[in-house]
């Protein structure tokens, strides 16, 4: 049974967040039996009044601890002043009359190993700025004004979703090099995202983490926005403002592993608690991190409660679940591993957790998106439970790898890799995909996106523009990491702001103009965003011209015309630096056509090649009833639509 405490409105949610549950046997038992999906309403630090006395109630799970006390600003960090009482099921609790919101605290745990360690609150709502690690008593108090957005949010399967991936610590910085406050970021980011035409932002580096170089993927504060950019209310302001501007918010969430930092979750009660005890299951050698024990109800509820904290309390619209493949397989990146009860390599406990997570989220936070970064061919990632994992979307890692491999090839040899750009069509209808070019593709000597392209600076930009146009006209939602929308030439550096000064240069501004135009077309045209998983959503016209490296395909709105469907457009890509005059491309209808977009336009940094004749010839071609004779600029993509009659000259 799910926790009956469920918010029906932001006002109700605010009330729920301010009223902790009684710390009694019944509620503790619900947590242990996985029936309490918001354990943060029970554990952690909560200002309360007991017997007319104001104070803070502290509670923590440490079943094998020998002794636990709460220390902080309210008692001079003296471990003898406020010992905690051992409660049922391995929980500890204490009421501290002298404690107040804004004060720092930790749990001083004498563990099963006899060592005494000061631990951060696993459910802490706010934390000191790194390198300090104390938790801070902090009840969230924010007046939301995004009701209109919250009432209509949806996973948006047949809506345009174009995501701008942003590392909150390095998108922009103050003149002194320090981080922007969330409120400063809110206005600057909303203005830019609106200008560029994205529908959503995906924020990484939001959850509290001790090491900047982890980019936020080694989390110690699963319930706390990082204090680098301000207080929890400041983060709430960021989300609220983006919603008021019509922009959705997704955050990266990391339930696959956690860091070994002594102050964090590691060996919390002097022995493995949140992590598997067997290092063959519980330790990532590649990442030097621990793996959550998904078989423990208390751990499962800790993670599910964290997800709901962001989706309910902070009004976030979706979670991008990191490193799902590492959770699904017991032999992931390891030579020594423990088979499951059936002798297989699948982590059955992690699979059960992911299914439960998605079921709870879709029940408790309807309209939110759950997105899996899953890099294998695990079946049914976006299929409903119980047979699938229940995610809404999955990153198209296969599309990304194949497409980047192709575009990194010298055009002379691309004909030998022609299939790399058509193979996605074989499996694209099997899942709900997001075509993601993320931060992972522009670090660790992989080069920035434009720098991956072969040739001189002009051809690199031409090739990158063609890549972007093919990405935006291929079925699937879109995600592009910050800086790549203006062809940043260097790899991402998390310690520095983006090089915004280059956007004043025409060659970078041109790529920026193209991304803006692509977002506009994508949002305006249903043929480009409806029917991603329909066979009829993309029809190949020319998929076999390997010698010329030319591709042509139709994007179609597969809905019946009575429901507003039937719109279509034609994309033609010439992916060599060779001008092709009068190239024949089959089309399904006669009459006039017009160019919606050419990546060779001068506005985008190209030469502005013209199309003198866009009247379809009656001779069939490529299995179609008619054909066009097109002038294909070098390293370019054209997007055309059928207009039926001769367009006016100003439309050409």
Curated annotation (Swiss-Prot):
Which CDD domains does the protein's record reference? AmyAc_Glg_BE, E_set_GBE_prok_N
- Active site (record annotation): 322 (nucleophile), 373 (proton donor)
Kindly list the residue ranges recorded as spanning the membrane: none
Q: Which UniProt keywords apply?
A: Carbohydrate metabolism, Glycogen biosynthesis, Glycogen metabolism, Glycosyltransferase, Transferase
EC numbers, comma separated? 2.4.1.18
Superkingdom as given in the UniProt entry = Bacteria
Q: What catalytic activity does the UniProt entry give for this protein?
A: Transfers a segment of a (1->4)-alpha-D-glucan chain to a primary hydroxy group in a similar glucan chain
Question: Which terms in the GO cellular component ontology are assigned?
Answer: cytosol
A GO biological process held by the record: glycogen biosynthetic process
Pathway assignment: Glycan biosynthesis; glycogen biosynthesis
Tell me yes or no: is Glycosyltransferase among this UniProt entry's keywords.
Answer: yes
Q: Which HAMAP family is this protein grouped with?
A: GlgB
Q: What does this protein do?
A: Catalyzes the formation of the alpha-1,6-glucosidic linkages in glycogen by scission of a 1,4-alpha-linked oligosaccharide from growing alpha-1,4-glucan chains and the subsequent attachment of the oligosaccharide to the alpha-1,6 position.
Subunit comment? Monomer.
Indicate the family of this protein. Answer: Belongs to the glycosyl hydrolase 13 family. GlgB subfamily.
Q: What is this protein called?
A: 1,4-alpha-glucan branching enzyme GlgB
Write down the species.
Answer: Deinococcus geothermalis (strain DSM 11300 / CIP 105573 / AG-3a)
